[in-house]
C-alpha cells in the first residue's frame, strides 16, 4: 500500500489540535459548571482541582496499555478508538447531574485518550528519516496549539452558547475528527497475535540507547512540570507585579499564549535544524535556553518583562518537542515504537499532574518567585543528566 504520509500528517495535526483543545477548553468555566451542579461553594476549588488532575492521572496510568495494543493492532486503529471514545465522554459531560458523575466522565476521558501519542508513533513510522524532525515538530505544534488555544475557545463558546452546550459542540468536533481519521488516515500494518508480540524484556534488549531514552522521558516530564507549575499562581503573580487585579485574567491569558506562539512558529524549523546537526544538540540548546528564561522570571518587576521571557521560553519548547520525539523514534525498534511513545506520554501526563501541585505547594510555602527557582533547579538537573547521556555523541560529533 502506498502511504501519503503528508496527508496523514495533516489529518493527524487536525486531530491532535482538537483532542489537545478538548483537554484544556474547560479550564475557564469548570469551577462555575461545578458550582451549577449544586456543589457547595466551600468545595468548588477542591472538586475543580480533582476534575482537572484526574484526567491526566488516568491517562498516564493506561497509556502503556494502549501503546501495547497499538503495536499489536496498529496506530490508526488506536487513533480512531481515542477520538471516538473522547467523543462520547466529552459529549456526555453536558448531561451530568452532579459533580461525581463529572469526575467519572473526566476520569474516563483520560482512560480513553491516546490520540496524540499514537499519531506521533504513526508519523514517526512513516516519514522519511531525514524529514522526521520537521514532521514531528510540525505535528507537535498541533497539540501545543490546541492546549493553549483551548481555554480561549472554551471561554468564547461558553459565553455564546452556555456551559453545557460547549461539551456538545466539542463532542461533535471530535466526531468529525473520528470520521476524518477513519477515511483519510492510512496505515500499512499487519496485526500481530498477542503471543507473537515481543516482551518488554526483549524490547529493552533491542534498545541500544536505554539511558538516553530514560533521559528523554525525564525531559518530557520536566517540560510539562515547567509548563504547568505556574498555572495555579500566574494570575496572582501578575496581580502582584502590576498592583492591580482589573486586567490580571486578560494579561495572564496573553502571557500563557505568547509562549505558544513562539513554540508553534519555531518548532518545525528547529526540527529541521535537528535533522541536520543532531537532535541531541537542539535538545541541549532548548534546555539551556529554558534555564536562562526561568531564572530571571523570579526577579521580574512588570508583567511585560514576564511576557518577554515567556516568549523566549516558547522557543525552548519548540526545540524540545521535536527533538524528544525524533530521538525516541530513532531509538525505538519499529515493532515497539507505540509502546515507547506511550511511556513518553505517561511521563507527559504525570508532569501535568505534578506541575500544578509543585507550583501551588512551593508558592504557599516560599512565595511566587520561588516557583520559578525550583523549576530552574529541575531544568538544571535535566541538563546535567542529558550532557552525561549524550557525552559520547558530543565528543565524537556523531548523531543518532
Sequence positions of predicted segments:
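Central cavity-lining transmembrane alpha-helices of secondary-active solute carriers
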Residues: 50-66, 257-268
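Conserved MFS/SLC helix-loop-helix module at the cytosolic interface between two early adjacent transmembrane helices
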Residues: 61-97, 274-280
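Structural signature of the two symmetry-related core transmembrane helices
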Residues: 77-92, 171, 281-296, 376
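Short amphipathic helix-loop junctions that connect adjacent transmembrane helices
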Residues: 29-45, 233-250
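Cytoplasmic helix-loop-helix junction between adjacent transmembrane helices
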Residues: 105-143, 326-327
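Helix-loop junctions on the cytosolic side of multi-pass membrane transporters
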Residues: 178-195, 388-398
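Juxtamembrane intracellular "pre-TM" segments in multi-pass secondary transporters
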Residues: 1-6, 187-216, 400
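Paired small-residue
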Residues: 89, 100-108, 293, 304-312
Amino acid at each position: 500500500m502506498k502511504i501519503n504520509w503528508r496527508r496523514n500528517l495533516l489529518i493527524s495535526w487536525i486531530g491532535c489540535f482538537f483532542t489537545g483543545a478538548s483537554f484544556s477548553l474547560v479550564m475557564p468555566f469548570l469551577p462555575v459548571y461545578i458550582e451549577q451542579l449544586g456543589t457547595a461553594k466551600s468545595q468548588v476549588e477542591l472538586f475543580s482541582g480533582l476534575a482537572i488532575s484526574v484526567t491526566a492521572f488516568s491517562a498516564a496510568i493506561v497509556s502503556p496499555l494502549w501503546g501495547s495494543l497499538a503495536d499489536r493492532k496498529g496506530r490508526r486503529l488506536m487513533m480512531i478508538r481515542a477520538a471516538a471514545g473522547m467523543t462520547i465522554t466529552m459529549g456526555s459531560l453536558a448531561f451530568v447531574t452532579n459533580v461525581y458523575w463529572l469526575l467519572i466522565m473526566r476520569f474516563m476521558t483520560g482512560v480513553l485518550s491516546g490520540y496524540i501519542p499514537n499519531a506521533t508513533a504513526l508519523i514517526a513510522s512513516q516519514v522519511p528519516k531525514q524529514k522526521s524532525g520537521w514532521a514531528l515538530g510540525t505535528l507537535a505544534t498541533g497539540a501545543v496549539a490546541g492546549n493553549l488555544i483551548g481555554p480561549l475557545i472554551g471561554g468564547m463558546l461558553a459565553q455564546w452558547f452556555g456551559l453545557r452546550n460547549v461539551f456538545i459542540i466539542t463532542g461533535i468536533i471530535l466526531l468529525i475528527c473520528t470520521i476524518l481519521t477513519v477515511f483519510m488516515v492510512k496505515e500499512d500494518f499487519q496485526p500481530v497475535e498477542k503471543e507473537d508480540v515481543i516482551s518488554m524484556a526483549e524490547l529493552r534488549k533491542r534498545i541500544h540507547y536505554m539511558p538516553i531514552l530514560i533521559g528523554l522521558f525525564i525531559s518530557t516530564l520536566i517540560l510539562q512540570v515547567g509548563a504547568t507549575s505556574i498555572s495555579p499562581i500566574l494570575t496572582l503573580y501578575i496581580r502582584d507585579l502590576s498592583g492591580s487585579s482589573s486586567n490580571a485574567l486578560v494579561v495572564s491569558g496573553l502571557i500563557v499564549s505568547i509562549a505558544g506562539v513562539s513554540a508553534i512558529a519555531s518548532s518545525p524549523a528547529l526540527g529541521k535544524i535537528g535533522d541536520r546537526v543532531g537532535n541531541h544538540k537542539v535538545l541541549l540548546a532548548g534546555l539551556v535556553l529554558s534555564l536562562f528564561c526561568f531564572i530571571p522570571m523570579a526577579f521580574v518587576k512588570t508583567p511585560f518583562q514576564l511576557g518577554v521571557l515567556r516568549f523566549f521560553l516558547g522557543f525552548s519548547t519548540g526545540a524540545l518537542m521535536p527533538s524528544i520525539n525524533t530521538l525516541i523514534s530513532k531509538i525505538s525498534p519499529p515493532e515497539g515504537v507505540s509502546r515507547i511513545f506511550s511511556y513518553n506520554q505517561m511521563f507527559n501526563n504525570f508532569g501535568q499532574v505534578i506541575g500544578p501541585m509543585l507550583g501551588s505547594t512551593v508558592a504557599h510555602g516560599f512565595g511566587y518567585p520561588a516557583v520559578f527557582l525550583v523549576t530552574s533547579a529541575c531544568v538544571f538537573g535535566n541538563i546535567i543528566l542529558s550532557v552525561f547521556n549524550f557525552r559520547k555523541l558530543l565528543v565524537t560529533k556523531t548523531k543518532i
